[in-house]
Amino acid sequence: MKRNRTQSSCFAILHIFIALGFTTILSSCYVQNITDDYKFLRQEAQERVTKTTGSIDELKDDRAIYLINAQQVKDYCKQHSNVIIYNFSPSYIMNKNLNANDFVDMCKANGVNALPIANSYLGLDKVRKLGVPVLMIRHQPYKTNKWRSYTKLFYKDVTNSNKRINNSKRFFSFKNGVYIGNFSTYEEALKSLQ
């Protein structure tokens, strides 16, 4: 009898650990952006999400969240002499993550066209007015909602490069529509245009 209670207790503890492990795995799906983060936007922000296929220059800074494709970005880069794209994560807070507003201000101060493009919906509804349209990668063409995957595929299309895209290098510079490189800091990207 004593032995059965001990076995029952062991099974109960085992079940608790299995349940905790399963819960941890499910919550890590959210953290790793395995789930579609669009559904975490507030209803008001979801209503502001707009698919667009026109020129980025025609978009307004009107609090809409514009879904863009790689061809629109390539066209924009061809129409402007110096462009720096900032692949930013709105909810990613680290000392190395440049604020999108600061990025836009720094580009304007240096006579460079700023193109901050969000790679995730998480926190995008909290981004304050940038002075440029709020742009988000349209990930549906890549048939994945994992931001690491669709971001690499998107920038591979934008750059027309066979080089490996490193997600930690968040700045892409273009001169007269030609891809110059992928950089870790704004300063490196700016220097590449001089």
PLM region descriptions:
Residues 38-58:
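Post-signal peptide N-terminal segment of mature Sec-exported envelope proteins
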